């Protein structure tokens, strides 16, 4: 049964509250989500580079709203190698046609790192006119014309495992790659291995809200932290830890089996970590 606009706004209210988004964002995100029911859904292109597809799997596990609602009611997913029925040259050409039609109005999501070594041949995402289209080519074209770029997962955000020392592919994160190419696209990092589905869907909501109100620049400048992550979802773990008082009192555990005390002495990276796991 199709959701009414009123029902969907109610659904989004519960959803965004679950995201932990500050109250100042709630009405706008609700409206941005709800507008997609009666208005034109923004095109989204999801391209996969060097990764394990884990970020796609976590997105498919979204429950509030369900992935069906996300794909069929909130966005228009025009390209995603894992879930789309189309394939081959036809699917790629469709993506490029839609990207041209909605230039400056679509969302470009990248999963996986971007390999630049060996002319980018380490990751071929399509073939057109007997030409192998590399991840580097697609990223440059789509990022330059996107309203916003979402770097989904740690590999896309910062390079992740593919960019580890000794890699032969020259893998790098999306932001670093675009900076190297001189492409000033607004990038929102959603790190995690994999990121929680709420972070992905919630960031899409923030993006829709910013696009609808022409405040994308403000979101990028004020809504992201120093590492390009949405502040709404990447809060400091240490400051929200149930053992914070023990840390401040200098009460440290001596073994991992100790029930009481702060785990910092055992190597906890809470003070340097950011995510809202304490709310999940």
Language model features by range: what are they?
Residues 59-65:
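Short Gly/aromatic-enriched secondary-structure transition segments
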Residues 36-41, 49, 56, 67-187, ...:
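Metabolite-binding pocket within alpha/beta catalytic cores that recognizes anionic/polar moieties
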Residues 7-30:
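N-terminal export signals
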Residues 201, 205-280:
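A conserved mid-domain beta-alpha-beta active-site/ligand-binding segment of alpha/beta enzyme cores
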Residues 1-3, 31-33:
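N-terminal secretory signal peptides
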Residues 12, 52-55, 155, 193, ...:
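Disulfide-bonded cysteines in secreted/extracellular proteins and peptides
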């Amino acid at each position: 049964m199709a959701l009414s606009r009123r029902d969907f706004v109610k659904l989004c209210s519960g959803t965004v509250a679950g995201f932990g988004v500050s109250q100042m964002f709630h009405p706008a995100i609700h409206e941005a989500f709800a507008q997609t029911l009666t208005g034109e859904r923004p095109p989204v292109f999801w391209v996969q580079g060097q990764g394990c597809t884990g970020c796609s799997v976590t997105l498919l596990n979204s429950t509030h709203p369900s992935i069906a609602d996300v794909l069929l009611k909130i966005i228009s997913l025009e390209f995603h190698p894992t879930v789309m029925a189309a394939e081959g040259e036809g699917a790629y050409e469709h993506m490029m046609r839609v990207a041209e039609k909605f230039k400056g109005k679509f969302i470009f999501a990248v999963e996986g790192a971007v390999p630049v070594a060996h002319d980018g041949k380490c990751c071929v995402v399509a073939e057109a006119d007997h030409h192998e289209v590399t991840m580097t080519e697609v990223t440059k074209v789509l990022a330059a014309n996107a309203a916003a770029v979402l770097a989904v997962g740690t590999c896309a955000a910062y390079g992740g495992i593919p960019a580890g020392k000794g890699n032969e592919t020259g893998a790098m994160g999306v932001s670093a790659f675009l900076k190297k190419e001189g492409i000033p696209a607004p990038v929102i990092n959603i790190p995690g291995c994999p990121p929680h589905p709420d972070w992905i869907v919630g960031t899409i909501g923030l993006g829709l809200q910013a696009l609808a109100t022409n405040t994308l620049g403000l979101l990028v400048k004020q809504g992201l932290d120093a590492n390009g992550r949405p502040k709404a979802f990447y809060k400091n773990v240490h400051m929200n830890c149930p053992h914070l008082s023990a840390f401040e009192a200098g009460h440290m555990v001596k073994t991992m089996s100790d029930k009481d005390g702060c785990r910092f002495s055992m190597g906890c990276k809470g003070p340097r970590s950011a995510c809202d796991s304490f709310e999940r």
